[in-house]
């Protein structure tokens, strides 16, 4: 159990800042400055959670002291029994709350509350890899549905035998990036492909990248330097062909502030038949691409301090194997194995994400000075 005074001192030191932020977010001048306002409202939520925890912590300590006093001075059996029960309950809750407070005091990834861009690409394995990429997309789509999140596809390149060579979509909702970020990496599948005539098990792979979606003020883009092209998009022929140029392609020269190297970014968006909507989505992906490159330095800095593979941001790392003959899924980062593959592929992935979250929280606690 942590030192009560140490925890209270840390919490008491945040009271003045909480009161200051509470006042600032009602200031019209602050509300007019959207970048500052968004930052302060996030800080307010974090501090509000800490203030609620502080109130409960102080109440538990008071309950214990009051119960001790009753047990020392009261002779009535019923009163003593009630006091003993109150003290036991408070002493049981206290260490649990202390761990919760420690986590609240350790800085979380500032991007956790953001929406996300989800990118899935078929890797080694040809047609089977594309089919598996499609399976992963459906898995995430069903998971997002259970979370009440909104998923919108911005571009898709279908595989010849089904699935996707590449599919990119945006996911909006509460704490999307903080939940899905653990899915970044290489997902490996072992199964008998539908095209396999000998019944042999093949190994294929698909890569998943989860990027925090950038907001307009997260990155600076000179929109006057963007080169736009439009083109027709749609199906292979007949009535599915889009007869107007609704597809958009943008090119933008960007200098990476971390390396000093300039690179050309090329983004296409063909998902809707509305050119302005496609331009809006392409621009959002451009912002996210640039923001992700800059955010990667933050992830690398965190990873260098930790031995865990849970959240290193290394998208080339093999993170999970899906073994169909055995109905088994293994997450290699935490040596976690489950045998409910059918349910997992149907979107039931929260338990695995919870285990990964616990593992990362343990690493965060090691960094805490408490």
Swiss-Prot record:
Main location: cytoplasm
InterPro entries hit by this protein: PCRF (IPR005139), Pep_chain_release_fac_I (IPR000352), Pep_chain_release_fac_I_sf (IPR045853), Prokaryotic/Mito_RF (IPR050057), RF-1 (IPR004373)
PTM info: Methylated by PrmC. Methylation increases the termination efficiency of RF1.
One Gene Ontology cellular component annotation held by this UniProt entry: cytoplasm
Post-translational modification N5-methylglutamine, affected residues: 239
PROSITE patterns documented for this protein: RF_PROK_I
Keyword Hydrolase included in the entry's annotation: no
Localization per Swiss-Prot or TrEMBL: Cytoplasm
Record keywords, A-Z: Cytoplasm, Methylation, Protein biosynthesis
Pfam family, one: RF-1
Molecular-function GO terms, alphabetical: translation release factor activity, codon specific
Function: Peptide chain release factor 1 directs the termination of translation in response to the peptide chain termination codons UAG and UAA.
Family, as annotated: Belongs to the prokaryotic/mitochondrial release factor family.
Protein name listed in UniProt: Peptide chain release factor 1
Lineage, broadest ranks: Bacteria, Pseudomonadati, Bacteroidota, Bacteroidia, Bacteroidales
Gene: prfA
